[in-house]
């Protein structure tokens, strides 16, 4: 981090806050007193933006480590954001993925994030996460993967639950996972009831149980809200975006 990149980041931050719709976070009274892990739908870039701008407590957000590396941004950004675009314009988005790389590196190396790795370096992700929790900082995770489970929410990558095991080993405390549903169309984020980690249950079973309960809770929150368009995890034309439930 340099002073110049930090100044650029603050300018971008200010512009995003100026033009991005103000989002109301509802249900904050359900948050536990201790630091917790928020698990939410990604909703494209809406999830990280809302987490950074409007989450009511001190927090760090898990982000793909590739977004902090100049050489790795283009391939990751194209695949994650634009690979579903029509073939005739994909070349334009491939070019755009290179253009945004320097800005991405600037933003994600200055924002309140923890880089997430998918190799042996993941232990660094876990250690930073546990340290943050010990210091009273909430963690926000968007664990969806490209495996459709229902119209609202894709299936979860489950290994993030292992952080709770390491946290318990270090502190003797049971961290709570808290579901949150982001509804950009309503300009709202809704927090649900916490799900507590059980250190006495085998970790494989805990991964499944916690992810299932969180997934169901987020889906239930979405379905309980007024009819609106859901921003899905998968890249697709906006005309294909689903509703949160069938119209009456």
Please report, for each region that a protein language model flagged, where it lies by residue:
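Helix-to-loop junction immediately C-terminal to a conserved catalytic motif
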Residues: 5-6, 12-44
């Amino acid at each position: 981090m340099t002073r110049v990149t930090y100044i650029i980041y603050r300018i971008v931050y200010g512009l995003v806050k100026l033009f991005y719709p103000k989002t109301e976070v509802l249900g904050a009274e359900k948050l536990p007193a201790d630091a917790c892990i928020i698990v939410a739908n990604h909703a494209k870039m809406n999830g990280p933006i809302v987490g950074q701008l409007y989450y009511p407590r001190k927090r760090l957000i898990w982000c793909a480590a590739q977004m902090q590396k100049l050489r790795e941004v283009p391939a990751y950004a194209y695949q994650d954001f634009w690979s579903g675009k029509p073939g005739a314009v994909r070349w334009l988005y491939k070019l755009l993925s290179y253009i945004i790389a320097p800005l991405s590196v600037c933003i994600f190396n200055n924002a309140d994030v923890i880089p997430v790795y998918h190799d042996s370096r993941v232990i660094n992700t876990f250690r930073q996460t546990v340290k943050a929790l010990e210091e009273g900082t909430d963690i926000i995770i968007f664990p969806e993967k490209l495996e459709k489970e229902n119209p609202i929410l894709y299936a979860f990558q489950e290994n993030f639950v292992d952080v709770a095991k390491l946290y318990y080993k270090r502190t003797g405390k049971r961290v709570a996972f808290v579901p949150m549903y982001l509804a950009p169309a309503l300009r709202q984020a809704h927090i649900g009831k916490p799900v507590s980690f059980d250190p006495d249950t085998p970790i494989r079973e805990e991964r499944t149980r916690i992810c299932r309960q969180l997934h169901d809770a987020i889906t239930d929150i979405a379905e309980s809200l007024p009819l609106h368009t859901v921003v899905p995890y998968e890249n697709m034309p906006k005309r294909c975006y689903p509703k949160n439930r069938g119209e009456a």
